[in-house]
Design a protein with these regions (language model features):
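Aromatic- and Lys/Arg-enriched surface recognition patch
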Residues: 56-123, 127
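Short acidic/glycine-rich loop or secondary-structure boundary segments that cap or lie
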Residues: 9-11, 51-54, 66-69
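A short secondary-structure junction signal
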Residues: 12-13, 70, 105-107, 140-143
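Short, charged beta-turn/beta-strand-edge "cap" motif at the junction between a beta-strand
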Residues: 45-51
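Compositionally biased, charged N-terminal/linker segments
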Residues: 1-38, 136-137, 144-148
């Protein structure tokens, strides 16, 4: 799951303990978000920043529910077509699990053969929520434990 650190960083999540992940406005990313269940782990990726990369691990605290920001006119994520009865967007609650000693950079991730087919690394991939296979998960955990 990707977030811009000035919106929500791994350190913000650590301080808060739990936060709402909202503002997903792409149907494919929304569907990935909706498929996540309480207790599942995810990699927290810092995007659109000087050092993009995987910064830590979070846990899904509660299954998806209608995203309230879609109904808030002052929100950057407001959707004029959404209503309380028909809100196509979802939010999810997340919890902090761990931060890595350093961000696992996009360049480092791209250099790993085991991650070559990872959705995040595919050309044109801009989704904020993407699946990670069990093999990819293990490869990234190994990188994080090496202190890269």
């Amino acid at each position: 799951m990707k977030s811009e650190p000035d919106e929500l960083s791994i350190h913000d999540l650590q301080r808060l303990g739990r936060a709402r992940w909202d503002g997903v406005r792409n149907y494919q990313a929304r569907n990935f978000l909706r498929s996540m269940q309480a207790g599942e782990l995810f990699f927290f990726y810092h995007s659109s920043c000087p050092q993009p990369g995987i910064a830590g691990i979070g846990r899904i605290a509660a299954s998806a529910y209608p995203d309230p920001t879609a109904l808030e006119p002052d929100s950057h994520y407001f959707d004029a077509k959404a209503s309380a009865e028909k809100n196509p967007w979802s939010a999810i609650d997340v919890e902090f699990v761990a931060s890595f000693p350093g961000v696992l950079s996009l360049a480092l991730l791209r250099s790993q053969l085991a991650l070559s087919d990872m959705a995040l690394l595919q050309k044109g991939s801009r989704l904020s929520v993407m699946p990670v296979s069990a093999e990819q998960w293990q490869a990234i955990l190994a990188l994080s434990s090496e202190g890269r």
